[in-house]
């Protein structure tokens, strides 16, 4: 780097002016899109100043050496980029990194041609991941960078990699394309064929995190030098799409299997021959693979590392790893694997080194699976379902080089001694989290190299003397969290090298004798046991013990000789016991001890325990019962001391050790400390925790000499005042941070001694710490009747007060005399306050029992509180000379009289409180001298009269309270002369109802309604009757003989009962109408759910729209791909299975590869109701695509009604105008509505064929989609030997029960039946016969049904050759699924309800009455080849001919006329039916018997299907 810095030369300004700035991203040509992008970019917090600005001549050219010649050449990096020398190269080559917003998007136009081609060998492009804008790479974007060797493009939302994008990059070695489209599911990443045709020298290719769904054929074939490929975190579903399948091992033409080859297989076979690459590393983890097929990686002969972890793989073919001759590391972890084929590692037996299978569902483990893998070094089988049944002497045979074996988190209950017979090189064995209850003798004897044995979290109860025989080099043994109640004294006899022993979490009551004389032991963990007593010789012979953990036991005392045999002990943990007594000198025998934990015990005193321990550095004695502490109790070398949660009232330092101690951390929180001073804290302290104590006083200079101080916690104490000297420290150097103090949570008082605290963080002298929680500090106001507390930072100078009794200013010379106005003397029984400047002087005499004005009230009083006394009158000149008085409280003092001169001299009075007294009248001159008065409170007196002009002189009056008096004729309109009045209170008086007065009063009320705060309560009195003044209809004034009269309206009193009844009826009627309107939806739901008035509320079926009746589906659901689980598992599960709706789901049933608009409209038109699940995922993904919007527009134009299901939180700002319009005009149902299902059923049409087992009719949904069967089925046909082609049924399926360890794949070759009659054609019976197959065990009833299924398949295969053209296409590896699956078998015959009898004449009689399906004739469309004795399902029985022969163990079927027909109940539903059988009485789901997943049509109108079924049953 120094070499390059020396080469940087200044550039002449003339040269600078000749070059213009070039940026990768230039301004878009359309101003409208530019403004739109600025708005979006602004939200994302991205600056566009450099990306979007036009070129400017502000570039400084960067010189670069040109090689050996030494001539510098200029390297001109674009403004969006920065460069650095490429690592690991001697030549001055450049690695360029460009940070862009997007690449060629609607916001930016990107020009990569400005990147200098010379010296640029590495280019890294990073886009802004927060911007969801689609980027684009143009053809030949990097064609000029002919020397480029590394190209990395990340976070750019690319949708396609064209075939000419990489043109010109012939020298490219390393390519990384990570769009991270996986976070934007709506955007896929597609790669065109021949996209890598130019980059033939590519060695490393990373295409991870791109949301790739599929790949072109042989896309990687041109990369002959490729050694590493990363395809992780995509959406790939078929391993064969990678193009690494070895097709040379597939069957040739002319075989029987070729006749049943599916359309997908033909397409694969017709592609070019498989290419062979020299890949050494392949990562396809985090995809959606569910099957690992045979020969899937067969062409990768040199592959060493294969990672297929974190997929959904549930089945692995026998030859899945065929061709991988050099495979060393295989990672199949975090899948759904249940079993593994026996021959999985057949070709890698001599090369495989590491196998990772953890976090699967493996419950079956073939004993031959791992045998003789003599190069295997690591095997991880943890987190599976393996039981001891599958671990025997053959499981690990031949693993002579195995070093690591992980069997943790399984269900092992026992270990046989022969299991580990060949594992003599094993070093680490993990058996944690199993169910082992005992260990047999010599179980681990063969593993003489084992150094780590983990047996924790099992159910071991006792450790036998011979359980650990042979473990001579064992160094770590974990037996924690078992149920051990004892250990044999000789249990560790052969583990002489043991260094770390974990016995915690057991039920031991004493220290095991087996520990004695274990001279190599370094650590012993006996915590969380039940040990109550430790003998003096408990640790005899443990001379090298380093750490001892005894936490969480029941120890009560420690004797002097307990640890005498542990001279090298350094860490001792005795926490959480019941220790109350520790003998002095108990720890002195262990002179090297450095850390001791005694917290959580019952110690009262530690005097003499630790003072003579010079090596002690760390001591925790918290949560005990200590009442006293002195620094002399601990050694001076101690660095960390924890005393929190004790009962300490002080920190004593009798010997003055504050300068000698080396203590750095001290925790004394949660104690009872009341005072701290300089000697309470050592000078070496760095971290001090004093919070949650009772500290009231912090002495000055407490922290003065604590030069290493970094943090002090004083919060949650009882500090009320704090002197500035209490926090003073020595000056801190500029390069060091000031100490941090936390003092919040204290009951500070806003006195005059604490005002400095408000500004302490702004002091620049660096002699005071920083208060980190200053904003949280509140202080209590000493005298404030409006609020008790105030935030310290909001307090004003007038809030910081101090009390005084007497004070004499320096300029006052009469203080020695009695009559001295400049002397401040607080009256008796009063409290006086002042601020720092004495501008605020408060005299508080409230409730002092004065009967007359207190004498000697200070002349400079600014606020006087004399309320709550017993004055009869306020005499004249009572406040004479108090020229500074601004606030006067004389309320609630029984004042009856005030005089004209009472308030003389109070020119500065602002607030006067005289409420709650006994004042009778105001004569007019009482307030004339109060020209600056702002607020006057006279409420709750007995004022009956107020003279005119009483308030005339109060020009600045703003608040006047007169409510609660006895006023009758006061001319309130005179208050208009007070221009600043904003608040008047007049209620609760006895205002006159005389008409003349009342008119003027009302007029004033109308004009001053905003000022009079209680105008609604103002009323007048007439003949002891009260009336609100604003009431106009209740009274009326008339003039008769010049006298105003008040008349009640008695005319209507006789009509009151009638009016009351009419009013109630009116209110009830409109209440009923309003209730029906408000709850109309609930009433509709109730009527629908109870079928109440259904014939009246809804149209009769004969009035239903004929077009809707012809639609095959009840509803079509559109939703986001991210909400697929919610729709499939919750909505569809309930609507289809519980209610019987026929649904079409977008991502399940619609061909999403077709044009979205047409597919969506076609699917919606095939259903009676269109339902859209609106969520945040839909708004951000699908709705952002034009196709969805146009489809929804078209549906609305066709008057297609839309029902919205609102799922999750919907951000309002992200809902555009179109969606808002649809939401306003459509039915919306919220998922979290408690009546969601009722409302949804009300919004949907009645299901077709209600009451039947309705199949989902997807003819309208699947238009243009190729039907296929279950590609993930588990059966023999999915093997390399068959090439993915389903063979015809043969007799070899009948017997496979003899092979006890056969998988489904091996059933075909197995021989010897196990309780089955030879059924020549039943592959399903073969599957059921396998004892240890990968599928669930079948019941007898299921075996019987499967046998019947085999016969049906036989007849279907006979019809196969005649009607090959009518067969539906099938996936390349698809096989029939004969076992229970998630797909229901509709219209199944319930044989559990039939009465089946064995008959000597082979007559299958009295089968019972079958149920009719959908109310149609079940016999319609039946094949004519049935026996003439056949009775339709509506009849009473099936009678076979005398010549019939029985088929099956329980005579379920009859073969009549030499096999000419089979009696099977064939039910019909709609236009399609499945030949199925059920074994449960409640129509539970059972496998279909058809060879394919297609259904047999029984409609007479379909001639082709009718012919097919006749031939099928011929």
Swiss-Prot record:
Glycans are attached at residues 111, 174, 230, 253, 331, 359, 406, 494, 557, 620, 708, 829, 891, 900, 948, 1024, 1033. The chain crosses the membrane at residues 1058-1078. GO terms for biological process: axis elongation; convergent extension; dendrite guidance; regulation of synaptic plasticity; signal transduction. Keywords: Cell membrane, Developmental protein, Disulfide bond, Glycoprotein, Leucine-rich repeat, Membrane, NAD, Receptor, Repeat, Signal, Transmembrane, Transmembrane helix. The keyword NADP does not apply. Disruption phenotype: Viable. Dorsomedial or dorsolateral mistargeting of VA1d ORN axons. No effect on the immune response to septic injury using a mixture of Gram-positive and Gram-negative bacteria; adult flies are able induce expression of antibacterial peptide genes (Drs, AttA, DptA and Mtk) and mount a proper innate immune response. SMART domains: LRR_BAC (SM00364), LRR_SD22 (SM00365), LRR_TYP (SM00369), TIR (SM00255). Residues 1-14 form the signal peptide. Residues 255-273, 1473-1484 have a biased composition (Low complexity). Residues 15-1057 are extracellular. Residues 1079-1514 are cytoplasmic. It is a single-pass type I membrane protein. It is found in: Cell membrane. Disulfide bonds join 752-802, 826-832, 830-845, 993-1020. GO terms for cellular component: plasma membrane. Gene3D superfamilies: Ribonuclease Inhibitor (3.80.10.10), Toll/interleukin-1 receptor homology (TIR) domain (3.40.50.10140). Pfam families: LRR_8 (PF13855), TIR (PF01582). Residues 1111-1244 form the TIR domain. InterPro entries: Leu-rich_rpt (IPR001611), Leu-rich_rpt_typical-subtyp (IPR003591), LRR_dom_sf (IPR032675), TIR_dom (IPR000157), Toll_tir_struct_dom_sf (IPR035897). It comes from the Eukaryota. LRR repeats lie at residues 145-168, 170-191, 199-222, 224-246, 276-299, 300-323, 324-347, 349-372, 374-398, 399-422, 424-446, 448-470, 471-494, 495-518, 519-541, 543-565, 566-589, 591-612, 614-635, 636-658, 660-682, 683-705, 707-729, 858-881, 883-905, 906-929, 930-953, 955-977. Belongs to the Toll-like receptor family. This is Toll-like receptor 6. It comes from Drosophila melanogaster.
């Amino acid at each position: 780097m120094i070499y390059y810095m020396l080469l940087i030369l200044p550039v002449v300004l003339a040269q600078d002016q000749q070059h213009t700035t070039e940026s990768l991203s230039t301004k878009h040509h359309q101003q409208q899109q530019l403004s739109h992008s600025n708005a979006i970019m602004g939200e994302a917090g991205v600056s566009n100043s450099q990306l979007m600005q036009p070129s400017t001549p502000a570039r400084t050219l960067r010189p670069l050496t040109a090689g050996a010649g030494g001539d510098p050449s200029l390297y001109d990096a674009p403004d969006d980029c920065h460069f650095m020398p490429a690592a690991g190269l001697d030549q001055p080559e450049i690695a360029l990194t460009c940070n862009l917003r997007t690449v060629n998007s609607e916001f930016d136009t990107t020009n990569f041609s400005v990147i200098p081609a010379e010296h640029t060998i590495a280019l890294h492009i990073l886009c802004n991941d927060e911007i969801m804008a689609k980027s684009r790479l143009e053809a030949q974007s990097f064609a000029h960078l002919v020397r480029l060797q590394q190209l990395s493009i990340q976070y750019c939302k690319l949708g396609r990699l064209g075939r000419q994008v990489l043109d010109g990059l012939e020298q490219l070695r390393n390519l990384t394309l990570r769009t991270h489209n996986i976070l934007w599911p709506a955007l896929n990443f597609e790669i065109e064929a021949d996209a890598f045709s130019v980059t033939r020298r590519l060695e490393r290719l990373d295409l991870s995190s791109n949301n790739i769904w599929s790949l072109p054929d042989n896309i990687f074939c041109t990369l002959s030098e490729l050694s590493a490929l990363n395809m992780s975190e995509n959406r790939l579903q078929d391993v064969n799409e990678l193009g690494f399948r070895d097709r040379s091992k597939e069957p040739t033409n002319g075989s029987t299997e070729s006749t049943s080859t599916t359309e997908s297989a033909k397409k694969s076979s017709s592609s070019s021959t498989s290419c062979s690459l020299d890949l050494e590393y392949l990562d396809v983890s985090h995809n959606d693979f569910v099957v690992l097929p045979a020969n899937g990686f067969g062409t990768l002969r040199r592959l060493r590392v294969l990672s297929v972890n974190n997929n959904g793989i549930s089945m692995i073919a026998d030859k899945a790893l065929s061709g991988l001759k050099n495979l060393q590391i295989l990672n199949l972890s975090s899948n759904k694997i249940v079993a593994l084929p026996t021959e999985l590692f057949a070709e890698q037996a001599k090369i495989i080194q590491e196998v990772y299978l953890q976090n699967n569902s493996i419950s079956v483990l073939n004993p031959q699976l791992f045998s003789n893998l003599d190069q295997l070094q690591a095997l991880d089988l943890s987190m599976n379902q393996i039981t001891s049944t599958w671990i025997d002497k053959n499981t690990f045979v031949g693993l002579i080089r195995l070093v690591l074996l992980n069997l943790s988190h399984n269900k092992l209950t026992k270990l046989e001694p022969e299991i580990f017979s060949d594992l003599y090189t094993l070093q680490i064995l993990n058996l944690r989290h199993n169910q082992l209850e005992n260990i047999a003798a010599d179980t681990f004897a063969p593993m003489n190299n084992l150094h780590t044995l983990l047996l924790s979290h099992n159910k071991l109860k006792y450790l036998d003397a011979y359980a650990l025989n042979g473990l001579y080099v064992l160094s770590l043994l974990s037996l924690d969290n078992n149920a051990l109640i004892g250990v044999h004294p000789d249990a560790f006899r052969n583990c002489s090298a043991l260094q770390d022993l974990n016995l915690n979490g057991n039920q031991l009551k004493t220290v095991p004798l087996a520990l004695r004389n274990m001279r190599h032991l370094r650590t012993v963990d006996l915590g969380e046991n039940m040990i109550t007593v430790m003998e003096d010789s408990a640790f005899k012979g443990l001379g090298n013990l380093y750490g001892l953990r005894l936490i969480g036991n029941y120890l009560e005392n420690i004797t002097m000789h307990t640890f005498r045999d542990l001279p090298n002990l350094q860490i001792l943990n005795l926490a959480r016991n019941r220790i109350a007594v520790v003998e002095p000198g108990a720890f002195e025998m262990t002179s090297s001890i450095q850390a001791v934990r005694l917290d959580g015990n019952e110690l009262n005193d530690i005097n003499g325990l630790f003072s003579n321990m010079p090596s002690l550095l760390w001591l925790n004695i918290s949560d005990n019962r200590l009442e006293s502490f002195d620094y002399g109790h601990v050694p001076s070398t101690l660095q960390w001391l924890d005393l929190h949660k004790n009962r300490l009232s002080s920190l004593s330092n009798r010997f003055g050790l504050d300068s000698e101690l080396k203590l750095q951390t001290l925790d004394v929180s949660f104690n009872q400390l009341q005072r701290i001073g300089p000697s309470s804290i050592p000078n070496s302290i760095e971290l001090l925790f004093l919070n949650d104590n009772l500290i009231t006083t912090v002495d000055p200079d407490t922290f003065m000499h604590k030069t290493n101080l970094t943090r002090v916690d004083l919060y949650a104490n009882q500090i009320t005042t704090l002197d500035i000297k209490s926090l003073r420290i020595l000056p801190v150097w500029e390069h060091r941070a000031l100490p941090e103090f936390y003092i919040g949570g204290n009951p500070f008082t806003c006195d005059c001694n604490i005002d400095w605290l408000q500004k302490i963080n702004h002091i620049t002298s660096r002699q005071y710490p920083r208060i980190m929680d200053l904003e949280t500090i509140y202080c209590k106001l000493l005298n404030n009747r409006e609020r008790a507390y105030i935030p310290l930072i909001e307090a004003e100078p007038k809030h910081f007060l101090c009390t005084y009794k007497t004070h004499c200013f320096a300029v006052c010379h009469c203080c020695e005399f009695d009559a001295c106005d400049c002397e401040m003397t607080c009256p008796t029984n009063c409290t006086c306050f002042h601020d720092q400047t004495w501008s605020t002087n408060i005299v508080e005499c409230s409730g002092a029992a004065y009967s007359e004005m207190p004498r000697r009230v200070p002349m400079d009083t600014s606020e006087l509180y004399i309320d709550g006394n017993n004055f009869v009158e306020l005499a004249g000149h009572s406040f004479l000379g108090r020229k500074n008085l601004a606030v006067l409280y004389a309320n609630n003092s029984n004042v009856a009289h005030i005089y004209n001169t009472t308030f003389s001299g109070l020119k500065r009075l602002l607030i006067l409180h005289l409420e709650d007294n006994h004042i009778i009248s105001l004569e007019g001159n009482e307030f004339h001298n109060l020209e600056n008065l702002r607020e006057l409170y006279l409420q709750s007196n007995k004022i009956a009269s107020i003279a005119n002009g009483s308030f005339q002189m109060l020009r600045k009056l703003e608040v006047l309270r007169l409510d609660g008096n006895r006023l009758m004729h006061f001319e309130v309109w005179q208050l208009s002369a007070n221009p600043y009045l904003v608040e008047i209170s007049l209620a609760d008086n006895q205002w006159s109802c005389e008409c003349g007065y009342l008119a003027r009063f009302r007029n004033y009320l109308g004009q001053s309604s905003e000022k009079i705060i209680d105008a609604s309560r103002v009323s007048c009195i007439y003949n002891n009757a009260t009336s609100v003044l604003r009431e106009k209809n209740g009274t009326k004034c008339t003039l008769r003989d010049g006298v105003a009269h008040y008349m009640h309206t008695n005319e209507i009193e006789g009509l009151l009962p009638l009016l009351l009844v009419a009013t109630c009826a009116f209110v009830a009627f409109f209440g009923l109408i309003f209730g029906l309107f408000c709850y109309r939806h609930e009433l509709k739901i109730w009527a629908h759910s109870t079928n109440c008035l259904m014939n009246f509320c809804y149209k009769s079926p004969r009035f239903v729209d004929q077009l809707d009746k012809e639609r095959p589906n009840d509803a079509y659901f559109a939703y986001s791909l991210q909400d697929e689980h919610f729709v499939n598992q919750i909505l569809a599960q309930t609507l289809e299975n519980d209610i019987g709706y026929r649904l079409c789901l977008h991502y399940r049933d619609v061909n999403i590869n077709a044009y979205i608009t047409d597919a969506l409209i076609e699917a919606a038109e095939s259903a009676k109701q269109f339902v859209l699940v609106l969520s945040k995922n839909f708004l951000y993904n699908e709705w952002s695509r034009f196709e969805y919007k146009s489809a929804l527009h078209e549906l609305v134009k066709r008057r297609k009604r839309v029902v919205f299901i609102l799922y999750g939180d919907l951000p309002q700002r992200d809902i555009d105008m179109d969606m808002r319009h649809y939401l306003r005009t459509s039915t919306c149902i919220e998922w979290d509505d408690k009546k969601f299902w009722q409302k949804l059923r009300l919004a949907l049409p009645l299901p077709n064929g209600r009451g039947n087992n309705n199949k989902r009719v997807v003819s309208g949904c699947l238009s243009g989609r190729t039907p296929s069967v279950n590609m993930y089925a588990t059966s023999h046909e999915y093997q390399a030997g068959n090439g993915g082609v389903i063979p015809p049924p043969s007799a070899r399926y009948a017997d496979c029960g003899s092979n006890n360890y056969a998988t489904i794949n091996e059933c075909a070759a197995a021989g010897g039946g196990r309780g089955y009659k030879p059924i020549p054609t039943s592959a399903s019976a073969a599957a059921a016969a396998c004892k240890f197959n990968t599928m669930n065990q079948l019941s007898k009833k299921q075996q019987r049904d499967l046998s019947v299924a085999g016969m049906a398949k036989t007849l279907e295969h006979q019809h196969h050759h005649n009607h090959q053209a009518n067969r539906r296409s099938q996936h390349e590896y698809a096989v029939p699924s004969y076992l229970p699956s998630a797909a229901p078998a509709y219209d199944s015959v319930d044989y559990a309800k039939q009465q089946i009898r064995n008959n000597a004449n082979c007559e299958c009689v009295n089968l019972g009455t079958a149920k009719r399906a959908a109310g149609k004739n079940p016999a319609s469309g039946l094949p004519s080849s049935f026996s003439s004795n056949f009775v339709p399902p509506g009849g009473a029985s099936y009678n076979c001919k005398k010549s019939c022969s029985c088929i099956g163990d329980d005579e379920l079927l009859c073969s009549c006329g030499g096999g000419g027909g089979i009696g099977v109940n064939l039910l019909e539903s709609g236009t399609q039916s499945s030949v199925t059988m059920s074994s449960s009485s409640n129509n539970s789901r059972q496998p279909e018997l058809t060879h394919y997943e297609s259904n047999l049509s029984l409609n007479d109108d379909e001639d082709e299907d009718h012919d097919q079924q006749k031939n099928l049953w011929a």
